[in-house]
């Protein structure tokens, strides 16, 4: 059992969330803030550190009026780093969607280690953390070339307790800075001096220290409120999936669905990976779990593409509320051969160079949403095949409520046990398992069933029309 009330701070790209959990693992409260665009004092687009910081203090103050917290666990995405010195933030993290100048990017690409060493593909904009550090040194060399480099969850841990730490799930997610098989910094990180500026390596579950006096005053926290080191958000979802009986002790893949669809294949036992066997050009990568094990992964921007395909005139369709209509429309779209072909978000995913197009774009929004569900399933199936996903598959996140997507994926992968997590709190549940590994899940997994109509001919046609020379396994 957890000891006292716990807060999980999940700082994503789009939203910052603070959830409060009771000692028996029940959700007590949830607070959400949309993140704003920001510009740093040095003139580059950055993440909204100041806005999140102010919101966090105000929210913690409201939370602690109802009862004190015993611990805070920070979670964050894997494409942000801050440079700090003592108790000062020297440089805020770049916005990873900002495009590097062409010359700056070319100079960085020439220095990267191979994918076969790092498991990090060359990603666009600032999605490789090394590219951000390289660009920061060009923008503000005096500030960027000294100080401690902190990844995003560990920045918030430092902000709350004043202790710097590095952690492997954040260092090992497409950063270019880490070797997932060897478990050490990359040669480029060493050569550029970045490895020597990383904070001491700590485990995600380590308590770094109690909150500072500043946060005792601003957030109303007690002096014994402990701050954990924290972890990468997708790894928290993986840790959550491992808390279910259906996945324990067996191969398991978690498909987290939101703006990004991230598939992470966790083997039952550690095996030696040949990183060169994964196609770098198709957005495959190798993450690292909380135990230091390499985790083959693949991604595409499914949530973003679904929005582009649906093109909602007003409110987007709620797939859970419209299940029967969407399934019927999906059947009709399959019979007519109406398809969305990849990729509508160029530069990422299994078809990064292909130009997205409709074979016959429906005028009706509901029909477009049905085809979007089929498209997401075909894209997910492709990514899952690329990383060798087998046995149990857990779909979590908002698209676990999309019946066309989930049932189409079950049709495409009949040899896998496909489960849905409708908890909508997989990330905080995974974070809580750092404190109590035996904490039972607060919602059972649901087994999904295939579509009630045949998808094989439609699938074959979609695959034959995709604009790639790669083989779909």
What is the meaning of each model-derived region?
Residues 8, 17, 109-122, 131-146, ...:
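Active-site core segments that coordinate phosphate-bearing ligands/cofactors
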Residues 33-37, 97-99, 199:
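A short acidic/small-residue loop/turn micro-motif
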Residues 181, 204-208:
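Short beta-strand to alpha-helix junction loop
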Residues 91, 170-177:
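Glycine-rich phosphate-binding loop of ATP-grasp-fold ATP-dependent ligases
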Residues 1-93, 145, 216-229, 391, ...:
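N-terminal glycine/serine-rich phosphate-binding loop of ATP-dependent small-molecule kinases
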Residues 64-130:
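Active-site phosphate-binding/coordination module
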């Amino acid at each position: 059992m957890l000891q006292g009330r716990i807060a999980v701070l999940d700082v994503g790209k789009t939203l910052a969330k603070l959830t409060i959990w009771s000692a028996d693992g029940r959700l007590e409260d949830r607070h959400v803030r949309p993140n704003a665009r920001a510009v740093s004092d040095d003139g580059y687009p950055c993440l909204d550190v100041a806005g999140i910081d102010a919101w966090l203090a105000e929210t913690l103050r409201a939370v602690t009026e109802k009862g004190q917290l015993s611990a805070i666990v920070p979670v964050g995405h894997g494409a942000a780093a801050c440079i700090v010195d003592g108790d000062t933030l020297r440089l805020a993290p770049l916005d990873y969607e900002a495009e590097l100048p062409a010359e700056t990017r070319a100079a960085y690409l020439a220095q990267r280690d191979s994918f076969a060493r790092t498991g990090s593909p060359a990603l666009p904009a600032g999605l490789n953390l090394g590219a951000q550090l390289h660009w920061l040194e060009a923008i503000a060399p005096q500030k960027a070339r000294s100080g401690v480099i902190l990844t995003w969850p560990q920045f918030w841990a430092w902000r709350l307790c004043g202790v710097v730490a590095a952690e492997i799930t954040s260092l090992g997610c497409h950063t270019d800075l880490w070797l997932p098989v060897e478990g050490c910094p990359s040669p480029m990180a060493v050569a550029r001096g970045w490895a020597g500026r990383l904070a001491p390596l700590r485990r995600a579950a380590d308590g770094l220290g109690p909150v500072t006096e500043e946060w005792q005053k601003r957030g109303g926290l007690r002096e014994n409120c402990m701050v954990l080191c924290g972890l990468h958000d997708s790894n928290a979802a993986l840790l959550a999936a491992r808390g279910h009986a259906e996945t324990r002790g067996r191969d398991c893949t978690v498909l987290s669905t939101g703006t990004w669809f991230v598939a992470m294949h966790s083997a039952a036992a550690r095996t030696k990976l040949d990183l060169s066997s994964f196609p770098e050009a198709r957005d495959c990568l190798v993450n690292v779990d909380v135990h230091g094990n390499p985790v083959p992964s693949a991604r595409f921007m499914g949530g973003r593409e679904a929005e582009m395909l649906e093109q909602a005139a007003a409110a987007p369709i709620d797939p859970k509320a419209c299940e029967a209509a969407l399934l019927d429309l999906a059947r009709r779209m399959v019979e007519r051969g109406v398809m969305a072909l990849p990729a509508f978000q160029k530069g990422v995913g299994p078809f990064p160079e292909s130009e997205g197009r409709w074979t016959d774009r429906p005028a009706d929004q509901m029909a477009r949403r049905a085809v979007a569900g089929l498209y997401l399933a075909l894209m997910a199936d492709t990514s899952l095949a690329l990383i060798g996903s087998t046995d149990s598959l857990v779909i979590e996140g908002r698209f676990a409520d999309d019946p066309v997507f989930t049932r189409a994926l079950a049709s495409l992968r009949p040899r896998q046990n496909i489960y849905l997590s409708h908890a909508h709190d997989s990330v905080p549940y995974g974070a809580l398992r750092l404190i109590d590994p035996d904490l039972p899940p607060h919602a059972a997994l649901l087994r999904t069933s295939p579509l009630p109509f045949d998808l094989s001919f439609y699938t074959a046609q979609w695959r034959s029309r995709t604009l790639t020379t790669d083989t779909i396994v």
